Each structure stands twice: as C-alpha cells, then as structure tokens.
From Swiss-Prot:
The gene is petC. It catalyses: 2 oxidized [plastocyanin] + a plastoquinol + 2 H(+)(in) = 2 reduced [plastocyanin] + a plastoquinone + 4 H(+)(out). Belongs to the Rieske iron-sulfur protein family. This is Cytochrome b6-f complex iron-sulfur subunit, chloroplastic. It is found in: Plastid, Chloroplast thylakoid membrane; Mitochondrion inner membrane. One of its GO terms (biological process) is nonphotochemical quenching. The keyword Oxidoreductase does not apply. The 4 large subunits of the cytochrome b6-f complex are cytochrome b6, subunit IV (17 kDa polypeptide, petD), cytochrome f and the Rieske protein, while the 4 small subunits are petG, petL, petM and petN. The complex functions as a dimer. Interacts with PGRL1A. Component of a mitochondrial large protein complex that contains, at least, MIC60, DGS1, TOM40, TOM20 proteins, and petC/RISP. Disulfide bonds join C162-C177. NCBIfam families: Cytb6fFeSPetC, PRK13474.1. One of its GO terms (molecular function) is plastoquinol--plastocyanin reductase activity.
C-alpha cells in the first residue's frame, strides 16, 4: 500500500498560507471613525494633563477679584471726591428766601450765616463760599476793617460756568478750567471769560443774619448796567 506524503516545498507553502490567514484575521482596517475617536482621546488627555498641572493657589478666586475691583474703584474715586467736597454743598436745591425779599446765606453745612459769628473766624481779606441766590456759590467778602462787604461775588465763571476758586497768594480769582482771571472784586482781568463775575447785595437783617438780595443797579466795578439782571 503506497503511503502519501507531502514534499517539503508543499508543506512550507501551506504554513505560509496559514500564517497569512491568521494575520488577516487579526488586522483591522482603519476607518475615519477610528481616527476621530483616537484624536478626541488625545485631546481629552492633553486638556486633563494641562488642568491638573495648574497649582491650586494659581486658580483665580472670583470673590477676591470682585474685592480687588471694588478697592481699585474706590481708590480712583477718592481724589475726585476730595476735590469736590468744598463745592458739593452749593449744588443742592436753594433754600427759601427770607421774609424781607432776600435769600439767607448758607455756610458749607447748610446753616444760616450770622454776621457776628462769621467775623470771629474769617479775617480781613477773606473770601469764603456760601450758598447764595438761586443756590449759586457766592463769596462773602471781609473788608480790611473787619466788616462784611455790602456785596457778594457769584463764583460761577462767565466763560463756561466753572466754580472759580479764590487764590489768596495772587489776590485773584483763578478759574482752573480755562485760565480766566478776576480781581479781588470779581472784575474780569483775563479771558477767555467775557464778563465780570455777577454781584449780589449782602445785607444783614434784624437777627444778624446775612441775606443776599439781587443786584440790579449799575456795576460799580465797570460803570455798566449789570449783565446778569
């Protein structure tokens, strides 16, 4: 009986075929979906690594940020508020007029100005703001003989309406907005302001309080009719 046997070449070919079949069974063809999944996994891994690498003390605290913002805002507003304090009182609604047709002068606290008390704390040459006619800031003037002048000087610049401070060193009213200047009586001596500061009568009533009364007569500084009447 003849036995059948395979030649070495045939056996080698069969082994190669078997290995190729096994390899093809294990090999998975890459698809678009597989690429997307791998990419997402890599991105997620990178983000996770970055987030976990930030120290806890470097993470912004929202409450701290709010507090710092408020402190910064307060710091910025302080200088402006401080500069406005001397003039803020004079932008409140004006008080009612006096019984004699005048308007009581009010100090920075809103109290009536009593002439005798005022002169105790304001010396010769003093010019201090009070609230006058229609609520306008108005300077009370102390004469060299330690008496109150019979006129008050409206502090509103005739250029664009800024409140004009008194400069004692230069003995002038100097407007900080555009450089207008007025002498000690409020007469304009340098533009761009076109006119002198307005006047008001400063009278003293029976109770010793200072009253401002509208000035309708000739302006004694210029000899002209009052432009503000």
């Amino acid at each position: 009986m003849a036995s059948s046997s395979l030649s070495p070449a045939t056996q080698l070919g069969s082994s190669r075929s078997a290995l190729m079949a096994m390899s093809s069974g294990l090999f998975v063809k890459p698809t678009k979906m597989n690429h997307q999944m791998v990419r997402k996994e890599k991105i997620g891994l990178r983000i996770s690594c970055q987030a976990s690498s930030i120290p806890a003390d470097r993470v912004p605290d929202m409450e701290k940020r709010k507090t710092l913002n408020l402190l910064l805002l307060g710091a910025l507003s302080l200088p402006t508020g401080y500069m406005l304090v001397p003039y803020a009182t004079f932008f409140v609604p004006p008080g009612t007029g006096g019984g004699g047709g005048g308007t009581p002068a009010k100090d920075a606290l809103g109290n009536d100005v009593v002439a005798a008390e005022w002169l105790k704390t304001h010396g010769p040459g003093d010019r201090t703001l009070t609230q006058g006619l229609k609520g306008d800031p108005t300077y009370l003037v102390v004469e060299n003989d330690k008496t109150l002048a019979t006129y008050g000087i409206n502090a509103v610049c005739t250029h664009l309406g800024c409140v004009v401070p008194w400069n004692k060193a230069e003995n002038k009213f100097l407007c900080p907005c555009h450089g207008s200047q007025y002498n000690a009586q409020g007469r304009v001596v340098r533009g761009p302001a076109p006119l002198s500061l307005a006047l008001a009568h400063a009278d003293i009533d029976e109770a010793g309080k200072v009253l401002f009364v509208p000035w309708v007569e000739t302006d004694f500084r210029t000899g002209d009719a009052p432009w503000w009447s």
